[in-house]
Amino acid sequence: SRGLGDVYKRQMYNSARSCPSRANLLTGLYPHQTGLGHMDGSHPAWPKGYSGFRSNSDNVTIAEVLKDAGYFTAMSGKWHLGNKSNPILRGFQEYYGLLGGFNSFWNPAVYTRLPKDRTPRHYEEGTFYATNVITDYAIDFIDQAHQEKKPLFLYLAYNAPHFPLHAPKEVTDKYMSLYMQGWDKIRDARWKRIVDLKLMQGKPALSPRGVVPESLFEDETHPLPAWDSLTKDQQTDLARRMSIFAAMVDVMDANIGRVVDELKKNGELDNTFIMFMSDNGACAEWHEFGFDKQTGVEYHTHTGEELDQMGLPGTYHHYGTGWANVCCTPFTLYKHYAHEGGISTPCIISWGNHVKNKGGLNHQPAQFSDIMS
């Protein structure tokens, strides 16, 4: 994203899943204190900590605080804090994005513009891709704040690279030769780079190849298979899945560059505090080979024309535990778990000339609640 990153903070701890982390980030409270101790669903029999995101009668969001302080507050992207509230009711003046947790990146009908009296942007058929459009609105909001001469608080919450894995084919194709090397070689290469860059303190060691955890879809925990034990068709299918994931990150990175360029154009970049982080570790759902429909259980190996169509409109895929183990290098376990693989993700910080140690590495542990509090 064009040089963004004055400080790389290695230990920024989240709450292991989307909803709890977002509630934690926006309120500075532990997820249970906001009603999102698990996810965004609720049930009358559940205790208060699991009752769903509560109103501002007992918590306040960073957007509400900054709005009262005179900021222009806007959000573009994934809300995923349940249907008891929405961004406008919780302090954001402008919103565009996905109110739920995940959906198609190709279908504009599942995205929402709020307040309801706003006129949404128009996109010709076949040109909509969510990551690009979320950025279009983010840039609109940046420009609106600049025109109104107000300080800006923008919460830019991309749904990429969450499943379903969707990306432009030409970007996906760039990564196929890399990921055909397989998850064992790539995990080893990532570990070597971590060591060479001195990203870990002390004398760290790479954890063994991971496991597929017991779950609703797996009767018992079992080891991940070695890449070389898979058939060529399985390897090609899995490499395609990871290539789509990489393409989603690639497109997101380019769009962050667009945001940075807009701030620079408006003369606001050096005066803007930017944090980039993730709401959880890599997603291992639900077995080593991923899944192909929203049920989470259906999977088959794609070949031929079907392989080429992966990631395009009308498809639905996830990459599975094998690649999640790579994405969490060098840690153990994944999203859902309170192990490092689930809760420890990097944070990149930029703040123009206000940062003393530009390009530095910070090992001080922090947690999402620290941002609001």
Give the location of each predicted region:
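Formylglycine-dependent sulfatase
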Residues: G5-S373
